[in-house]
Amino acid sequence: DDAAVDQAIRDNDLVSKFTCLDNPSADQVASWLDEGLVVARFSKRMEFGQRALGNRSILADPRRWESVERINSKIKYRDFWMPFTPSMMKEEADRLIENPKGLYSPFMTLAFDLKQEFRLAIPAAQHPSDKTVRPQMLKREDNPGYYDIIAAFRERTGLGVVLNTSFNLHGEPIVESPEDAISTFLRSDIDVLLFDHVAISRSNPSS
């Protein structure tokens, strides 16, 4: 909860070391992604499994191939060929991917071909060899806070999709507690650590 987050922030003296922004809006988060910043989102209950679905996720701009290079080399410390996956608004799916059967894929379990016209648009969130994506299709009622970030990103960029990878370092489990999130933030090159009611930034984030 927020109290546990606040305590972890105090315990790690983050206020004196970084910029803290209270109650960041979805549009502010979208603006950081649009600027090329890498944002780690920690929200509510833990997630576990093979995929992160927005509440323990590292987010980046899918339009920038440098997002892949930076996350691999300075955050996830993993092999260059391992692809990242996108989270997209459900209503964007038909526009972005080939899905003739209208399949709904909320858990990143199905692979789809990107439509030809979008292969150059989101290079960071597709398989570099076969140009497929394994998307999380997101309805607002499933995760309003996360959905609103993606919707705000669409307002800015015309694309209702973000790069989403699990919030952890390579070889470690997905972060569970605020302390885990802060530890991973401090040991990596993540730009912004986003909790529900506060954001911790390595620099002075624009609004």
Residue map of PLM features:
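Flexible beta->alpha loop and helix N-cap segments adjacent to enzyme active/binding sites
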Residues: 1-207
